[in-house]
Amino acid sequence: MSKMFETLHMYFQYPFVRYALIVGVLIALCSSLLGVTLVLKRFSYIGDGLSHVAFGAMAIASVLNITNNMLFILPVTVVCAIFLLRAGQNTRIKGDAAIAMISVGALAIGYLLMNLFSTSPNISGDVCSTLFGSTSILTLTKGEVWLCAILSVVVVAIFILFYNKIFAVTFDENFARAAGTRANAYNLLIAVVIAVIIVLAMNLVGSLLISALVIFPALSAMRLFKSFRSVTISAAVMSVLSATAGILISILVGTPVGSTIVAVDIAVFLVSYGIGRITGR
């Protein structure tokens, strides 16, 4: 046990390890807050589609040699989030068809561009890191950490500020409309915030594993609690603890950060599911 703590203490002497833990906790908190809303509104598929869009945008940013690629990826992902939300309300283009079209197209174009215009000698490694977050969170600069921190604070502030409206739109959108709530505006706000979370989470778990970071804590909390507030708070706690444990385990064992965090999330869900079955929840 003492050797384990000595190893962790040694690693935490390096700034990039501290940056990884800070960003991991912030992203886990943000993703869990909106994850409950996405699951209840059946918007989970939007997160998966936007993660592929973010991958394509990252490929374009690398081709254009954009230094801070997050400033390019973020607006592109937000625009696509708005489009997907509008597509879901379009009777001609079904929402699931639009998401499948955009996600697969963005993934294919992104990989094609990385092969055609890549300046890196290790394309496979770059793609693996982008898709699964194997090393990208360990290469964060101080500027990127500050950007993640600022965006995370904005996301949490938006959720707290509009909590009642988000709650109303989540549980009964038709009633919320009848009560005078601008449901379309708040659905748009949710989509934009999710786009921001997707971009932030790419460095943590990679574009293919982002949905797990959003969905698993919410599902785990729903097995144990019933009220929206309790589920949201417990999902946030589970997500932060899972991210922290995943990062620490990956440091000690040498496993990929993103996959380890998702594995911990899965373990927490299985435990929650078992407790829910035993208690009859």
What do these predicted ranges mean?
Residues 255-262, 266-281:
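Cytosolic-side transmembrane-helix boundaries in multi-pass membrane proteins
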Residues 203-259:
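Transmembrane alpha-helical segments in multi-pass inner-membrane proteins
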Residues 140-217:
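Helix-loop-helix "hairpin" substructures at the membrane interface of multi-pass membrane proteins
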Residues 7-10, 103-160:
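Transmembrane helix-bundle core of multi-pass membrane transporters
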Residues 36-51, 55-121, 221-233, 250-254, ...:
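Short loop segments and helix-boundary regions at transmembrane helix junctions
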